[in-house]
Amino acid sequence: MLEGKVVVVTGASGGVGRAVVRILGEKRAKVALIARGETGLAAGATEVGAAGGTAKVFPADVADHRQVEAAADAVEEQLGPIDVWINVAFSSVFAPFDEVEPEEYERTTAVTYLGYVWGTRAALRRMRPRNKGVIVQTGSALAYRGIPLQSAYCGAKHAIKGFTESVRTELLHAHSDVKITMVQLPAVNTPQFDWVLSRLGRHPQPVPPIFQPEVAARAIVYAAEHPSRREYWVGGSTAATIIGERIAPGLIDRYLGKTGVNSQQTDEKQPTGVANLWEPADEDRDYGAHGSFDRRSKDRSLQVWLSQNRTRLAAALLTTATAALALRATRRR
């Protein structure tokens, strides 16, 4: 479904974005990779080509709307009209709220929230006149439920969800055929936990259970191919978080108050490498898609399979039920 399509991916140099572009290469898409880290971008482009796709890199800081707009222009000049735009890029700070500096809050918000705004804006300016196209927002269970030590990131993810809902309703009002969908992710094993700006005493980690970036990437690409659903949840932990927040938010407050700080740290010392909030960590080194938690990470999710195959599953259950009723009726005769 994506063969020959022009697909833009922000945050494409590492982590989930890197895993996404590799899958797009396997689908023989024309992939535009946007990020700051040029070494990671170059390695990602090589992987796309090796997988069978076409790749072009467009170094840009998504927090700057001028750079995003210029990148979108360059994509259409070099690859053709943009069919799909996938927002993945983000940054964060791991620290208690009162230890985060104002400029760090501003920067996290500019990258993680406004980066999606500028990407969506650039995509819509090109898609709406053509009345076709797909925008995929990479979200998180933390778009529904805030946790300690990540107030800037959680606030940005909540903002993306509200922003996306607003834009979707405007597209529906205009009877536009442009689709916008959101994929809410669980904890993912990405390099971000090695390069995030952190003031914790120990090495930050995703809140278990942890999934490999390919699990997230497959769900994101699936959403790009099936954008009519307004939202996708990835992993049973994401579903449990969202449903739990709806049913018993106060209980989750108390639970996270007791467990949320320790569950986001290992017993190892804090990394001493570059923090990517201000400068790309992968400017001179390629980190790839995976972080430091391969041994503890799951490479598949039953919940994702059930979500993507619910129509076939329902049909199979209906067929089974019908057959059972028919057999029962036959026996009564």
Regions found by a protein language model. Give the residues of each.
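SDR active-site lid
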Residues: 173-268
